[in-house]
């Protein structure tokens, strides 16, 4: 932080003022593991192994953060997951 001429503190330009957004995927009793894994790979561009781990986390905990990044990218990922009616939420 630095002070401006009025004595008020300002954030340095290189300090990020906003945390990245997160996509949360919720468990359901409709989709198979293979459907969820395939859609996670498509949406997040992760490996199948990572998608499997995320699918198990969703299954075991009822939900999981499956992606983090800027809001626009999170909206894109969420939209792809919802193509097959998976339930998601974006947190900022």
Predicted features and spans:
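Terminal domain-initiation and capping elements
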Residues: 1-92
């Amino acid at each position: 932080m630095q002070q401006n001429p009025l004595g008020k503190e300002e954030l340095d330009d290189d300090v990020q003022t906003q945390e990245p957004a997160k996509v949360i995927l919720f468990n359901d009793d409709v989709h198979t593991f293979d459907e969820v894994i395939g859609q996670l790979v498509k949406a997040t561009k992760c490996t199948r192994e990572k998608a499997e781990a995320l699918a198990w986390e969703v299954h075991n905990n009822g939900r999981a953060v499956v992606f983090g990044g800027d809001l626009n990218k999170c909206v894109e990922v969420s939209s792809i997951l919802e193509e097959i009616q998976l339930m998601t939420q974006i947190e900022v």
